Amino acid sequence: MQSQNAQQGADALRWVSLGIAVLAAVWTLFHIVWTLSNHAADDYWGIALVIMFILALALAFARFFQERALMPDKVEHAAEEPFPEPAISRFFLASTGASAVWFVVRMNVGAEWLTAGWEKVSSPAWGASGKALSGFVGAAMAKSSGPNPAVQGWYAWFLQHVVLPNAGLFSFLVSWGELAVGIGILIGALTGIAAGFGVLMNFNYLLSGTVSVNPVIGMFGLFLCISWRVCGWLGLDRVLLPALGLPWKPGAWFQSDASISTNQRQTGYSS
């Protein structure tokens, strides 16, 4: 009876977490449509996402402590690990129980990248001429002088000798890159990789002397990179990651016939 009640409690937490994720997705979709329709952005979207994040985080903690109470010996550490990873860290970075938390984070980061990218893609100034990017580079280079420059000398050299002569190419990469990163994070497709490229752009903006939302979005992007195993679970990564696998553990799409035959013999199933 006790185990049945515990299972019902776990199911309830799971469904409530999923409900928060659905609400965050609908709210973010509305925000994106509203912003791309040339309406002024408001703070209600961010405030609502913060509330949803706190609720999802509280539910994730509840699921963690519930799992620990039901299965205290579930987490086993390798004998050669000098500093075993704490159970709570393993839960948030590798357990699907924390996927709703990362889903809310994805909605925030993905929407920021998608709206920023769409604004650039739809602007002629960010086209092949590289007009907007050239102006951005010029403003950044102006910050590279003085005793404590906001833009370091080596990065100013990179902007002047690499980016500026190829402004059209970099304009294309930045505008479409931001759009692709936003879409990838929102739909949860190779989320860790998409977030990694996003963090790379955040760092470049910061090195150019532009603060804006880059520290916050960059920090959230790093969290998505660290939690790559589970942050896209409520998304396409639930299918893509098992199919693609890892360099040291190929997925179903890259398994050899011998491996498939071995798995079939071990499981007793055949096609």
Region annotations inferred by a language model:
Residues 1-177, 187-271:
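Extended, low-polarity transmembrane helix blocks
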Residues 180-184:
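Transmembrane-helix motifs of polytopic, lipid-linked glycan transferases
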